[in-house]
Amino acid sequence: MPLVARAPQLIIALAICFAAAGCKKHEPPPEGDILETLRAPTVSGAAFDPHSLRGKPSLVLFVSPTCPHCVKELPEAQKAARENDANVVAVFIAGKAENAKGVLEHTKFEGVALVDDGTLRRRYGIRSVPYTLVLGADGHAREQFLGGQGEDTLADAIAEAR
């Protein structure tokens, strides 16, 4: 088959690759103090006080334990946060706490890990993951991303949130 005849298929394949690589969401991030509404239990079932995040920028990643892009993003976000003196929070929006614990062990994630019962997903209008909110030290969202972003993009977003 000549290359010209395969052009539509190649264009579609490239579009899928770019979409899978992640994209920045161009809508404004949610308004208001996110830390006032970021309430969910930790994977161990303990209560979480979101106000403990105040004073430093935070990356809040909404992930699924069965999403390979999410699993890949967790250690990259953790490294970006650690190297830029920021908090990192993983919010598992699907599955059970046991599944989340397996991902946390596999990725050696050391940040705060929460399990959402669907409340946060609905509140922030999350339809796909990974979805990341970058919060300033005051708890207000400065940026949001849909799809995997990688360490450098997340580090830049933390710097801009300061």
Features from the language model and the residues they span:
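Bacterial N-terminal signal peptides that target proteins for export
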Residues: 1-11
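Structural microenvironment flanking redox-active thiols in thiol-disulfide oxidoreductases
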Residues: 71-107, 116-119
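Short, internal strand/loop/helix patches
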Residues: 104-138
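N-terminal "domain-start" segment that seeds a small globular fold
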Residues: 23-50
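Short active-site neighborhood of thiol/selenol oxidoreductases, capturing the structured segment around
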Residues: 49-71
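C-terminal motif of bacterial Sec signal peptides marking the signal peptidase cleavage site
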Residues: 18-22
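Thiol-/selenol-based redox modules, centered on thioredoxin-like
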Residues: 83-85, 134-162
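Hydrophobic beta-strand anchors of alpha/beta hydrolase catalytic cores
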Residues: 59-60, 88, 132
